[in-house]
Curated annotation (Swiss-Prot):
Domain (PLD phosphodiesterase) ranges: 209-236, 423-449
PANTHER family attached to this UniProt entry: 5'-3' EXONUCLEASE PLD4, PHOSPHOLIPASE D - RELATED
Protein name (database record): 5'-3' exonuclease PLD4
Keywords: Cytoplasmic vesicle, Disulfide bond, Endoplasmic reticulum, Endosome, Exonuclease, Glycoprotein, Golgi apparatus, Hydrolase, Immunity, Inflammatory response, Innate immunity, Lipid metabolism, Lysosome, Membrane, Nuclease, Nucleus, Phospholipid metabolism, Repeat, Signal-anchor, Transmembrane, Transmembrane helix
Native organism: Homo sapiens (Human)
pH dependence: Optimally active at acidic pHs.
Tissue distribution: Expressed in plasmacytoid dendritic cells and monocytes (at protein level).
Transmembrane parts of this sequence: 31-51
GO cellular component, one term: trans-Golgi network membrane
Protein location: Endoplasmic reticulum membrane; Golgi apparatus, trans-Golgi network membrane; Nucleus; Early endosome
Lineage of source species: Eukaryota, Metazoa, Chordata, Craniata, Vertebrata
Enzyme class label: hydrolase
GO molecular function, one term: single-stranded DNA 5'-3' DNA exonuclease activity
Top-level taxonomic group: Eukaryota
Alphabetized SMART domains for the sequence: PLDc (SM00155)
């Protein structure tokens, strides 16, 4: 603990009675007081001059011009803060749009609900950029040659890379925080962008937390947001099933998510260490106890972002696991979840540990409150088959006679004539919906993703019946889930997987 430079003044103690002062005593006392004041004044001036010349070190995490995106180089705040922030917030007219990727050759039923295509949404979001684009991403692989594949389905990713280069050519700042080491060892995307002026930082999460940076979100101009399951990978646009959300014209939420981006950014400098306590400027004012309240297309809405792991949650930030459990705990009617992986264990520790936190929450909701639980899990050629006993165990709790309803299905994307594309053709979504709230995240459901891996979540609640022109966000997400649940690509655990598109064969 730092000691103060000087002690607080203490009132002098005087005797209860004193002899009367003589006139010359008063004069002498006055001269002494004046002399003391003069000495103090001269000393203060000397001290101020001395301190003025001493450079003061920045606080931990303070932004320095050489370390920040170009849009920050004239101060320690993003380009849109603080001069324009208040004015922009007054002009906020928040809008949330669900976005998704449907793999090629995976037709949905005619007239079924759908979200905006992800590739289209990303390109439109970049078209709105005027000052800066900040991207947090697990890895980058936007071109076919990145993985040695020549396939027309990579064209959308290549168009996205070209769009980003065009933004840099228009002097729009691009800052990227990505995980190190990376899965995309042969990708040149970030080198290409850096050569055009992009600022790239690799965050050594393995050294810092023994995890990875698994987040996937954008902050554009401190005003618009994308977040969801999709990586910066061309396969996420055409070969993998994804779901996310774009939020437009919502600077309060965008600048809150920007604080999470900044936690990654400051950890991307050489020899960075995790702080014991994050500085106040990283703190969030929005969380599950005090969410953002605003109008989304005129509809009263509450929303907040969560984050993981706990070490990357400054004061006020709700932990991602806590957000998931809170949404589950508030459900009274149903919990529908779509995730790529479901393990009530660790996935990347040896030996693995049992971790039934989410599993217990689903069981408690179904058994204790009669909540209808549906879990839709992805399966592809790279799926770990040891997941399926856990899924069967969860479904075994179901007992309609006792009003306990737990159903599990496996979503299988047919490989078809796309076998030349590795690590694709899978449901990669990570979302949950209840009658009260929508949760969209970036994490698979196992312990490591919440204890050591960097991820984010978005929790949104809209008032039923407050939107005469359309459904609430949670209703829209429920419709998308039920579309997938009732499709021919969703197979019950008591069924049989068609073809050779999944490691599990029923």
């Amino acid at each position: 603990m730092l000691k103060p430079l000087w002690k607080a003044a203490v009132a002098p103690t005087w005797p209860c009675s004193m002899p009367p002062r003589r006139p010359w005593d008063r004069e002498a006392g006055t001269l002494q007081v004046l002399g003391a004041l003069a000495v103090l004044w001269l000393g203060s001036v000397a001290l101020i001059c001395l301190l003025w010349q001493v450079p003061r070190p920045p606080t931990w995490g303070q932004v320095q011009p050489k370390d920040v995106p170009r849009s920050w180089e004239h101060g320690s705040s993003p380009a849109w803060e603080p001069l324009e922030a208040e004015a922009r917030q007054q002009r906020d007219s928040c809008q949330l749009v669900l976005v998704e990727s449907i793999p090629q050759d995976l037709p949905s039923a005619a007239g079924s609900p759908s979200a905006q295509p992800l590739g289209q949404a990303w390109l439109q979001l970049l078209d709105t950029a005027q000052e800066s684009v900040h991207v947090a991403s697990y890895y980058w692989s936007l071109t076919g040659p990145d993985i040695g594949v020549n396939d027309s389905s990579s064209q959308l990713g290549e168009a996205l890379l070209q769009k980003l280069q065009q933004l840099l050519g228009r002097n729009i700042s691009l800052a990227v925080a990505t995980s190190s080491p990376t899965l995309a060892r042969t990708s040149t995307d970030l080198q290409v962008l850096a050569a055009r002026g992009a600022h790239v930082r690799q965050v050594p999460m393995g050294r810092l937390t023994r995890g990875v940076l698994h987040s996937k979100f954008w902050v554009v101009d401190g005003r618009h947001i994308y977040m969801g399951s999709a990586n910066m990978d061309w396969r996420s646009l055409t070969q993998v099933k994804e779901l996310g959300a774009v939020i437009y014209n919502c600077s309060h939420l965008a600048q809150d998510l920007e604080k999470t981006f900044q936690t990654y950014w400051v950890l991307g400098v050489p020899k960075a260490v995790l702080p014991k306590t994050w500085p106040q400027n990283f703190s969030s004012h929005f969380n599950r106890f005090q969410p953002f309240h605003g109008l989304f297309d005129g509809v009263p809405t509450t929303a907040y972002f969560s984050a993981s792991p706990p070490a990357l949650c400054p004061q006020g930030r709700t932990r991602d696991l806590e957000a998931l459990l809170a949404v589950m705990g508030s459900a009274q009617e149903f919990i529908y979840a779509s995730v790529m992986e479901y393990f009530p264990t660790t996935r990347f520790s040896h030996p693995p540990r049992y971790w039934p936190v989410l599993d217990n929450a689903l069981r408690a909701a179904a058994f204790g409150k009669g909540v209808r639980v549906r879990l839709l899990v992805g399966c592809g050629l790279n799926t770990d088959p040891t997941m399926f006993p856990y899924l069967r165990s969860l479904q075994a709790l179901s007992n309609p006679a006792a009003n306990v309803s737990v159903d599990v299905k496996v979503f299988i994307v047919p490989v078809g004539n796309h076998s030349n594309i590795p690590f694709s053709r899978v449901n990669h979504s990570k979302f949950m919906v209840t009658e009260k709230a929508a949760y969209i995240g970036t994490s698979n459901w196992s312990e490591d993703y919440f204890s050591s891996t960097a991820g984010v979540g978005l929790v949104v609640t809209q008032s039923p019946g407050a939107q005469p022109a359309g459904a609430t966000v949670q209703e829209q997400l429920r419709q998308l889930f039920e579309r997938d649940w009732s499709s021919r690509y969703a197979v019950g655990l008591d069924g049989q997987a068609p073809g050779q598109d999944c490691v599990w064969q029923g």
